[in-house]
Amino acid sequence: MLMHTVAETPTFSRQADKLFNEGERRELIDYLAEHPLAGDEIPGTGGVRKMRFGASGRGKRGGVRVIYFFGGEGVPIYALLAYSKSDKIDLNPSERRAVATLVAAIKLQGKQSK
């Protein structure tokens, strides 16, 4: 099975440090690497996806939400944000705009490096 590279943003890394133990984090990264289209696309974000991930016995429904971007074959998966469902359910409009801006910069960087 094809495995994609997963790049963590500094924000994701800080959030993941608080939400996952080492094994859970490795499991999440491996899952994303194997299933880059696993989550649902968030409208208005330029292709950002949201995936549920169970952590520390919380299960998928009550677990963690992982926000990430996959731009296609040959492009890394960018882990952008992670948060507990108890902290928030969805991204607010300003967060959506912020991730859309970040994704636009990632896409531009990708075009410039080709």
Roles of regions detected by a PLM:
Residues A16, E24, L32-P36, R52-A55, ...:
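Generic secondary-structure microfeatures
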Residues M1-G23:
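Arg/Lys-rich, positively charged N-terminal/basic patches that mediate binding to nucleic acids
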